[in-house]
Structure formats: C-alpha cells, structure tokens
Amino acid sequence: MILIAGPCVIESRELIMKVAESLRKFNEMSGVEFYFKSSFDKANRTSISSFRGPGLQRGCEILAEVKEKFGYKILTDIHESYQAEPVARVADVLQIPAFLCRQTDLLVAAASTQAVVNIKKGQFLSPQAMKHSVEKVLQTRSARAYTPQSGAASSDTKAAQNSARSSDTEICAAQNGAQGGANDGSSALGAQNSCGARSGVQNSAHACDASSAANSAQSASQPSGEGMHDLARRYGVWLTERGSTFGYGNLIVDMRSLPIMREFAPVIFDATHSVQMPSIGATSGGDSRFVPYLARAAAAVGVDGFFYETHPDPAHALSDGPNMLNLQQLERVVAQTLAIQKALGF
C-alpha cells in the first residue's frame, strides 16, 4: 500500500524535520511504501494574504534534506510548467493539483521528467473524465525512454523503453482491448485519439486532448479496460480522489469513483482534503473528525494507497489546519485501513 503523509505546507525547516522524525515508523512498516509530502508553495490559497510557503528553491532544499537524512521518497506539487524539471531533481513524485488536472502543458512538463506523476481529480470533474489526463502523460512518455523510479511501478522497464512507435501501438492496443468489454464504441474513440499522436510533445498533448464532450458522456457508462491501468502503473501515473463539489463550500466523496478511475490508473484516496470545506471566508475550512470514516470506507472499496496531510498541532497550522489529521491519530488510522485491505484481499 502506498502511504503519502506530511504537513500541507513547509511552514519551517524545524516543523518539517519534527514531522519527518515522527513518521519514521511508517517508512519501516511492512506492506507500506512511504512518501513524505509537503508543499513549497501553496499557489491556490483563497486569500492573497495567506501563507504560501518558502518558495521553490528553499522548499526543495528542505525536502532534499529530509530525503537525505531519513531516506524517504518525496512527493510535492507543482503549479507551473517551469517547476517540473528542478523539482523532479528532488521529488520522486510530482503532484498535479486538482484545479490544474486538465492543464496540458503542466501535465506534459511533469511527464517529461523521470518522476511519477500523481494527478489529483478536479472537484468539478467526473471520474471518467480523468482518463484524458492520464492519456496526456502516457502519450508524452511513450515518445521518450522512461524508467520508473517508484516501487509501485512495474519492473518491466525494457518494454517501457521501447520506441515511440511501439509504445503508441501498445497504448492503443490496450484501449482498443477495453472496447471489447464496453461495447459502446467510446473506448475505440479514445484509442483513435491516442493513436493519432506523434513523438513530439506538442502533438502528443493535442492528440490526447481531442476527445469531445459527447465522447466523454458516452464513455461514462463504462470505464476503460484493464490494459490502461497496467500501462499507467508501468509509466508512473497515479490518480488521487479528493472529493467532489457539492453546492457551495462543501465536498462529498462518491466512492464509485475509486473503482472507475482504477480501471485506467492506480488510485490514491486523499482522506484529508475530502473533508475540506472550500473558501469559508478568507480560508478553507474542514472537519477532520470524518477523516477516519472516509479512509475506512475507501479501504473497503479498494485503493492503491492513501494520502493524509498531518500536523502536530492542526489548530495552529498555517494552511489547511481544519482538515489535517493530528500526528497522534495517524498511526491508528493507517493500521485500520491496512487491516481492512488485508482482510478483503486488496
């Protein structure tokens, strides 16, 4: 099971080192692939006066220190295309924020590195629509030699390093194979769009973004097939569920989205942002009481990993305090989800 945990934002070097020290047990836990998470810049804060973090250079220095001292794999988010290459020198996983999950240039820039790309599902999107974001990364990486760095990826690196033509053929074959189970023509349309890509990054991005709204609606009744999930795992593409907009200032989690998205990529469940209440006044609110309940529900449905923002004193955190899990609660929640997944054979 993948476990991603850490403070929302790098508040200070001292806080990050304190939290990193407290998380040692998870890096040594059997059956857990641990990633330390924190953001160097919260570029999407509600208010211009809200704390954003230390910035790219200092933030990456602190994350690099965590990596060197504790041996942790690192996950952090990027908001602009130019950030992908320098951040990937430190981070094992580049995270695409939910609000930016359709931004082709950002996805292509992240895919052009050797880091795993974790795409958070937009609160405004259906789970089926996330297939197109995955395709953008797959098409970009099929035009390059890509070697997975994460243990969550397949060890079949030889196939991942094939020529652009053979990789494109494989992706298209996987999506065409999905059509046999769907019988509605939608997967064939998606495959046709994918097969139109060329080795150039720009052409790849354009081909993957060519699906129409009508095609998305048609495919909603049946997700893509198993082959695409395997390709996403090998090429280092994850999806993260973090709730869906439910009126103003509220989110809900439709657990059906987990198996739907898992048809075409490994899926992480973000239990902390799922209890967020966006834009309550000048900051976002939330209710962390519900984190354990949603995490256990997701474990019962079956996911590839969990994402928890955690803090020693959430009430005084500089970002996302109301929905962060107290460090003292994290071990119990992780143990419960592991037990559920083990009991159900996930």
Identify the residue ranges that each predicted region occupies.
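Glycine-rich, proline-tolerant flexible connector loops at the mouths of alpha/beta enzymes
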Residues: 7-13, 35-56, 310-320
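Active-site-adjacent loop and "lid" segments of alpha/beta metabolic enzymes
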Residues: 49-57, 95-100, 248-255, 274-299, ...
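Alpha-helix-loop-beta-strand connector modules within alpha/beta enzyme cores
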Residues: 52-74, 110, 114, 258-267, ...
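Catalytic beta/alpha-barrel core
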Residues: 55, 72-80, 92-105, 116-127, ...
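Catalytic alpha/beta core domains of metabolic enzymes, predominantly
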Residues: 114, 118-143, 227-310
